[in-house]
């Protein structure tokens, strides 16, 4: 996955290209939620019990298993929000999260073509260097 800063820069550039003024304004008013969404599930890679192998890492699960269902549920959850501000905050977060997924989807084939898919200390370091 691209690094935190890479995801943020991608999100800023994507935001600048949004033509729809309603969407543009919602994201502007909810910049923090959008920025958090841009990080996707990557924050969970730093959850210590999962990093040490005591539990399955939720970041891996969200990235690799039933991704379509995850997005479907994420989007459906917005319909239960009754306050307009809550809806806009959730909308901005989801827009950011989708941006995260788009960048990961575009970058991974390139990264894998450069370093392969096997995991070792060397390839993992190269993998992170390319993504960042």
Q: What spans do the regions from the language model cover?
A:
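N-terminal, motif-rich segments that launch catalysis or mediate targeting to/interaction with membranes
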Residues: 1-92, 110-132
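Short alpha-helix carrying the canonical HExxH Zn2+-binding catalytic motif
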Residues: 91-99
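Alpha-helical transmembrane segments and their lipid-water interface positions
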Residues: 104-108
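Short active-site segment of divalent metal-dependent hydrolases/proteases
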Residues: 44, 99, 103
